[in-house]
């Protein structure tokens, strides 16, 4: 290797180290063993091109991170939705840990900028490839778990993932009306009634407001582009209120 290329490699290395420092500052996560952090972002193509150096790719960390992510998301959903059936919990978890969701999170955190790639993978757009980014997110979770345990993983997810669940980002896979019905029937509280209380907007862009009541008492209000969507959002609000009341008792 010429002195010039050795200097270039060294410069690249220090630049990458600086990037990882900035990244840790930005997400308020500081690794005790930074080798694990670097490994989480090391693609197999990079290792193949640097065989003389002791680099490890992120595939084993990805395997571990997948399991850790499923566990932490499962724990959160189990506690948050006491009335939700096993089938619905499974569907919701699948929507949260599916590739498009993980890719969206990886983009939000600029994971693609940090990935160590081989030249061939780089030239074919690997840095933006969805499967690669989803794998890196899982590998990062695996690395964080190995470095610090389950609690810091949950703290990280509390900032970047759980609020999205709370804000209804995955509500398209949830049937809140059925959940509310089951919750009310289980406690023998009576029957629910849905009513469209308001409609507005032109015919091609209508917005509906729905109210769900129990024994004439309004429980939740929701809006949507269709009557069904508005009713689902009303049921979601009602369910959240009932569950909050239940946990206080």
From Swiss-Prot:
Annotated ranges, domain DRBM: 175-244
Role according to the record: Digests double-stranded RNA. Involved in the processing of ribosomal RNA transcript to yield the immediate precursors to the large and small rRNAs (23S and 16S). Also processes pre-scRNA (the precursor of the signal recognition particle RNA). Probably also processes some mRNAs, and tRNAs when they are encoded in the rRNA operon. Probably processes pre-crRNA and tracrRNA of type II CRISPR loci if present in the organism. Involved in degradation of type I toxin-antitoxin system duplex RNAs.
Key word Repeat present: no
Catalytic activity, reaction form: Endonucleolytic cleavage to 5'-phosphomonoester
Compartment(s) where it occurs, according to its Swiss-Prot or TrEMBL record: Cytoplasm
Alphabetical keyword list: Cytoplasm, Endonuclease, Hydrolase, Magnesium, Metal-binding, mRNA processing, Nuclease, RNA-binding, rRNA processing, tRNA processing
Residue intervals of the RNase III domain: 20-149
Protein name, UniProt field: Ribonuclease 3
Subunit composition and interactions: Homodimer.
NCBIfam families cross-referenced by the UniProt entry: RNaseIII
Chief place of localization: cytoplasm
Amino-acid positions noted as binding Mg(2+) in the UniProt annotation, renumbered to this chain: 62, 135, 138
Stated family: Belongs to the ribonuclease III family.
Catalytic residue list: 66, 138
Biological process per Gene Ontology, one example term: rRNA processing
Domain of life of the source: Bacteria
GO molecular function terms listed in the Swiss-Prot or TrEMBL record: double-stranded RNA binding; metal ion binding; ribonuclease III activity
The protein's Enzyme Commission number: 3.1.26.3
Organism per entry: Bacillus subtilis (strain 168)
Any single Pfam family the record assigns to this protein: Ribonucleas_3_3
Segments for region (Disordered): 218-249
């Amino acid at each position: 290797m010429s002195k010039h290329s050795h200097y270039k490699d060294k410069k690249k290395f220090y630049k990458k180290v600086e990037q990882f420092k900035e990244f840790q500052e930005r997400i308020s996560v500081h690794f005790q063993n930074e080798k694990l952090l670097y490994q989480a972002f090391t693609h197999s193509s990079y290792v193949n091109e640097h065989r003389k150096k002791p680099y490890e790719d992120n595939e084993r960390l990805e395997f571990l991170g997948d399991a850790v992510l499923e566990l932490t998301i499962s724990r959160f959903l189990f506690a948050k939705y006491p009335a939700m059936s096993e089938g619905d919990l499974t569907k919701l978890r699948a929507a949260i840990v599916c590739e498009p969701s993980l890719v969206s999170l990886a983009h939000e955190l600029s994971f693609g900028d940090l990935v160590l790639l081989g030249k061939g993978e780089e030239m074919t757009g690997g840095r933006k490839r969805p499967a690669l980014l989803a794998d890196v997110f899982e590998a990062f979770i695996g690395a964080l778990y190995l470095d610090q345990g389950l609690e810091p993983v949950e703290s990280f997810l509390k900032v970047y993932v759980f609020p999205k669940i709370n804000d209804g980002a995955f509500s398209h896979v949830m049937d809140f009306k059925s959940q509310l019905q089951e919750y009310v029937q289980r406690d023998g509280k009576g029957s629910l009634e849905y009513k469209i209380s308001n409609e507005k907007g032109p015919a091609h862009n209508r917005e509906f407001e729905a109210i769900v009541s129990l024994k004439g008492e309004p429980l939740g209000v929701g809006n949507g582009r269709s009557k069904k969507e508005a009713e689902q959002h009303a049921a979601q609000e009602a369910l959240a209120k009932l569950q909050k009341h239940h946990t206080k008792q």
